[in-house]
Amino acid sequence: ILCHYALLFLLALPLLGLRARALGLIAGAWLVLGPVLVFAVVAAAQAAVGRQEFFVGGRLWLSPGPADLLRPGLLLADLTVTGYYPVLSWGAFLVLGLALGRLPLDRRRVAAGILGGGATAWAAAGVVGAAVLRAPGTVGRVAAAIGTDPVETALTLRTGEPRLALLIPDPLWLALPTPHSGSVVAAVLAAGWACAVLGACLLARPLVGHAALRPLVGAGRIPLTLYVGHLVVLALVDATGLDPADGALLAALVVLSLAAGLAAELSGRRGPLEAVMARLSRAGGERAVGGR
């Protein structure tokens, strides 16, 4: 996903000068229209080259690696449209984050608005998604599309599964609430829940006290270090034959992340990877200014 983040950050550059209202409108439109555009592009591509041919050669099916630079067209298609996190639809979350970051988050009225708006969006999308899942024929239609048992499919629709990418040519995909499916309903569910949690945390901050929140504040300052660090831990765990999905491992990662966040907060320093990125960004900016 780091490749996707890199592309998202580049696309965000023209938006940095916009105000919260404009960014919010863009994010809202992107949440709805992004998945529709992905649906249209992928459906058209499958119609042009054939369904099976598209599945075999239309995406990487793995996280991008250095060798994929030798296939720039396929790499770009995977990052923007056909991969697990297509920027064409997932970019909405970055723009939403930019919009929220422009708001005066220390005001309780703003925090309450974020909580209320997020909860409303989440509830509305949840009602729509639940109605679609309960509608007669939905599970059978999905099972026929991806070639799975209806009982397994019913569970898959509630938990998420990469094979749902095979559903994209069917417009029903746009209304599925399945996590990480990239549908319109799933996008609004995720965005609404994220806003609701953020608003609730902002409202709870004065009640909890700054000292108790320092591990969380620090963790928020070193997201890249924590993300890459947890990938390294998961790779080491997987190499030992242990189960990466073990609940004890999740608890350990949470504790380690909070400990690292507290250390970053107390030291007042960036994380190691954040420091590297800051130096690279500063060097690139100075070179760009110097070359004018």
How does the language model describe each region?
Residues 1-292:
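Alpha-helical transmembrane segments and their immediate juxtamembrane cytosolic regions
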